[in-house]
Design a protein with these regions (language model features):
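Mature N-terminal segment immediately following signal peptide/propeptide cleavage
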Residues: 63-101
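Bacterial N-terminal signal peptides
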Residues: 5-15
Length: 218
């Protein structure tokens, strides 16, 4: 609902906003996204829905036989590279509403530690978490989306403060564990992955992937 509200509000944007300076529009967009988030979080979480209907019994707790230990180790390795301030920004309880805080639009006020504020070692560890968690195809798709976001910046008069490959944020919910529930989220323009882990079982939902443009020549 948060995402839908933002999409509808941007589609129905009044003409007087279009004429406003970019900085004023972005500030107004951010305020709209904050209000939409507050309204959405005020509603009780009901589960995964399709067309407004809760989909029951989607995922049963069962062993898959596929170890998630590489994912746990990669998450711990990332946390080890972060300083105390960064850890405080990126760590949340496993049942925190942070799971519901994501949006496609670039102007959304995000949580966690951004790739743009990481040093090279931290960034490598963050990509290491993605590599351990996703298939080779999924990792490539994620990196391609991030790189195409920089292309979008180039197409918008080099507006890299708004669009670039490092404007993506990672949060971790719960403590990376072999037995207890935990997970992570990456959130940014055209790339949102919610990754929940319980033992050797993984649930990735919701996920949003997109791109603008879709193809760019190097």
């Amino acid at each position: 609902k948060i995402l839908l509200s933002a999409i509808v509000s941007s589609i129905l944007l009044p003409s007087f906003l279009i004429a406003q300076p970019r900085s004023d529009r972005d500030a107004r967009f951010r305020q709209n996204s904050i209000r939409a988030e507050q309204n959405g979080l005020a509603e009780p979480f009901k589960g995964v829905t399709t067309n407004g209907e809760v989909q029951k019994d989607l995922f049963h707790i069962r062993s898959t036989g596929v170890s998630t230990e590489p994912v746990r180790k990669a998450a711990l390795a990332l946390l080890k590279t972060l300083n105390p301030e960064q850890q405080a920004k990126t760590k949340f309880p496993v049942d925190d509403p942070e799971w519901r805080k994501w949006m496609n639009q670039h102007f959304y006020v995000r949580q966690g530690v951004g790739f743009d504020e990481m040093n090279p070692t931290q960034r490598d560890a963050a990509f290491g978490l993605l590599k351990a968690s996703l298939s080779a195809k999924g990792l490539k798709l994620s990196k391609d989306i991030m790189n195409l976001n920089r292309t979008l910046g180039e197409l918008n008069n080099n507006d890299f403060p708004q669009y670039n490959e490092l404007l993506y944020w990672i949060t971790l919910m719960g403590e990376p564990s072999a037995t207890e529930p935990w997970g992570w989220q990456i959130d940014g323009h055209h790339l949102i992955i919610n990754y929940f882990v319980l033992g050797d079982q993984v649930v990735m939902s919701p996920v949003f992937v997109g791109s603008e443009p879709v193809i760019a020549e190097s």
